[in-house]
Amino acid sequence: EELCTINPTAEIFLGEISEKVLKGISRIIASPGITDSHPFLAAAHSNGIEVISDIQLFVAEADAPLVAVTGSNGKSTVTTLLNLMCDSAGKSSLAGANLGVPALDLLIKDKPDFYILELSSFQLKRTQDLPVMVAVLLNISSDHLDWHTTEQEYRKAKYHIFSGAESAVFNRGDADAVAHFPRDIRSLSFGLDEPDGDGYGLRNDAGDVFLSYG
């Protein structure tokens, strides 16, 4: 009903979608829950139709710096903390995407100082351009293999968060992630070991463990 109000001429299809609908379509914004193996999307790819995420559409319209967070675990917590940190620093921010408010719904709110996006591997895979100010990759474990088929495909989607980043935060304890990390951007690492240089880690001082930098 809301869509009909916004665009009365839009055609709405409910249930199974016939491949005949593909005629005349140049782009599909697909739900992240639908895999590329779905017959409709598979047919779209076969016909050379671009399939993108809502995030791709969002970044084309957003006019404030973006901070993107991904990882198998902890991304919702970190996204929420970053939002609270902005508030404590006197900066306005809006958090969403894979957490809470859908990314496109953030665009109808007042422009913030920062957008903080939690991104899933599904969203990252279908997002070609991701010009973020800071990209954060927390960790990667075998997950969502029903969607990505292999762990390497899953990792490839996660690593895409760095593709257009100005700066990045990454887990140096993941050797594969370190190997795929771009060397031409500013970076900050973290880990459970002692920090060495520009990063955070844990130091043991006479039995007391401290979070330490440098």
Which residues are covered by each model-predicted region?
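Phosphate-binding loop of NTP-binding sites
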Residues: 19-24, 32-172, 176-186, 201-204
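Active-site loops of AMP-binding adenylate-forming
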Residues: 107-108, 193-195, 213
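Glycine-rich, highly charged phosphate/nucleotide-binding loops
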Residues: 5-23
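Short polybasic amphipathic segments
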Residues: 200-202, 206-214
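Conserved catalytic and cofactor-binding micro-motifs
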Residues: 6-9, 199, 203
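Short beta-strand elements of ligand-binding domains
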Residues: 14-16, 52-54, 189-193
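N-terminal beta-loop-helix "entrance" segment that forms/cooperates
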Residues: 1-8, 102-105
